[in-house]
Design a protein with these regions (language model features):
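Solvent-exposed edge beta-strands and adjacent loop segments
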Residues: 1-75, 121-136
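Surface-exposed, hydrophilic segments of mature proteins
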Residues: 4-6, 22-23, 92, 104, ...
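Extended hydrophobic/Leu-rich segments
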Residues: 13-17, 100, 151, 158
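Intrinsically disordered, low-complexity segments enriched in small/polar residues
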Residues: 18, 29-31, 87, 91, ...
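Short, surface-exposed linear patches
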Residues: 59, 89-95, 144-146, 162
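Short, cysteine-centered beta-strand-loop-beta hairpins and adjacent loop/turn segments enriched
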Residues: 74-80, 148-152
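Short, acidic/charged, Gly/Pro-enriched secondary-structure junctions
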Residues: 80-116
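Mixed-charge, glycine-accented linear interaction segment located at domain edges/termini
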Residues: 117-162
Length: 162
């Protein structure tokens, strides 16, 4: 019998940041304090109109993904700590890069207990801290610096697809 369609809720789309190292990753949930985190694919297009046609053609030739974020600063949260370390230290280049997993919990992996996931490296561009009068707020944008790596995530470990 075919699966019944259901509405996917926002809490089923999870993001995790590697707050460890490349050699020993620690995937920390991007959640506590975050009030905005949504991906923009920012497709790059090539448009042209040939002399024998009435309609212009447009092809997608690339992407420039970005993920704007806004977060209330919480103490002892490893994701907020990593972002603040980059912001307060005015880090640049590879020192401002983070790995982020995007996990779709409604999209089950082939191994029991796993979900399909995408890993990508982003440059962290924090543009301001201090908005708000109730809580300290930090905001910025993660800008893609790598291609995606498809795989699965079991809540602790990312396994790249073969």
């Amino acid at each position: 019998m075919p699966e019944t369609a259901r509405l996917v809720t926002r809490d089923e789309l999870k993001s995790y940041m590697n707050t460890g190292t490349s050699a020993v990753p620690v995937w920390s949930l991007i959640g506590e304090g975050f009030t905005a985190l949504s991906e923009n694919k920012n497709p790059k297009t090539y448009a042209r109109k040939y002399i024998h046609e009435r309609t212009e053609r447009t092809d997608v030739i690339g992407y420039a993904p970005s993920v704007p974020f806004t977060a209330d600063v919480h103490t002892v949260d490893p994701v907020i700590a990593k972002i603040q370390e980059i912001y307060n230290g005015e880090k640049v280049g590879a020192d401002a890069q983070v790995e982020i997993l995007t996990v779709r919990e409604w999209d089950i992996g082939t191994v029991v207990g796993t979900y399909k996931a995408i890993k990508r490296t982003y440059s962290t561009v924090c543009d301001k801290e201090g908005d708000g009068t109730d809580a300290l707020v930090i905001s910025g944008t993660f800008h893609a610096v790598s291609n995606i790596s498809n795989g699965t995530f079991d809540g602790d470990k990312f396994t790249a697809a073969a």
